């Protein structure tokens, strides 16, 4: 495996232009539709139960099929992306999701729907990881955090989008239309990616395909020079004299030396994200009801509290490049841990609402930091997708078992204990991140790739 630092330096000196906006548009559109299809399942299941298509057992199988697909996709997508290219991995998984979602619109029974849901999950698990990880290789280091966060901001509108469209489509048409809309949209993204999603020059150079990387990058440079009416600045003497380095890209490097440290930090970061995300967002309505708030009011209060999610991601995009990554992530975890406990001891509805809103605001700032920004930055180019894929797969496993732990604590000890245990775990994760995390803010991917 070869790595060519000059290619990275030339990508980092580019001013933002239509080239970057097209890449951003294709990936963000794909992530939005992926989220739409994922959250549409929640809306569709209620309809399937009411019309006799499904029951609690089949609903569980439907949900588990998606989660298992996510797990498989996260692992396989990383290998495809590192061995065969970012563009090919992205487009293959777009096609899988598009065909599976379209097929789900025409299934004859629930068993076929569960099968297509698994295929959707496999493609979406890979697509999310490949999208975020690939994006980091195109965006200049000085604004990489901000634009990766914006990618997350667009993608996280999908719950509201699926809920809004689902209310109309399922009521007046059919649940099948939800999958058909998502499938057609994904296939449109697949078509557009064929025209505008180029192969990562960093990946080409890393594979020793220097001529291909040079051709792709020179074309981009010429487009930007014409668009901006400028001449790109020359590279520094260090950048222009960068040498080719040979690195073997075996998957097992993730568990050796410096890479093991990064792998463990990444797993810790995602464990913190998943246990907080699934504890807080999934169980908020239940905790409301257990606190004596009626169901209708709990649903309304949950909707109000979740407004903090897009606002948190929006603010994260504005400020994330102004603070060191380790400080930013660990501080957010400490804030969430403290707010979680304060939130759990509130008894008045207005206090629950205010503290819940603020907690969700900071939680989604952390979700943005972890999934969209920090994790994709941690890895050398030749391991980026496999590293991201593996730690995301571990995160999926944690997400599967977290609800059972929360349910046991909630049943035997109450909601305050749930948030106390969560707080202790988040504080431990913050400690690991602050001590062992590596700093990636405004650092070129080539510098981050250095393995000591």
Swiss-Prot record:
Keywords, in A-Z order: Cell inner membrane, Cell membrane, Membrane, Transmembrane, Transmembrane helix, Transport
Annotated protein name in UniProt: Inner membrane metabolite transport protein YdjE
Q: Where in the cell is it found?
A: Cell inner membrane
Q: Name one GO molecular function term.
A: transmembrane transporter activity
Superkingdom of source: Bacteria
Q: Which PROSITE patterns match?
A: MFS
The entry's family comment says: Belongs to the major facilitator superfamily. Sugar transporter (TC 2.A.1.1) family.
Q: Which GO terms describe its cellular component?
A: plasma membrane
Segments on the Cytoplasmic side according to the record's topology features: 1-20, 81-91, 141-152, 199-265, 321-326, 377-388, 439-452
Q: Where are the transmembrane segments?
A: 21-43, 58-80, 92-114, 118-140, 153-175, 179-198, 266-288, 298-320, 327-344, 354-376, 389-411, 416-438
Q: Which InterPro entries match?
A: MFS, MFS_dom, MFS_trans_sf
The way it spans or sits in the membrane comes to: Multi-pass membrane protein
Among PANTHER family, the record links this protein to:
SYNAPTIC VESICLE GLYCOPROTEIN 2
Q: Which residues lie on this side of the membrane: Periplasmic?
A: 44-57, 115-117, 176-178, 289-297, 345-353, 412-415
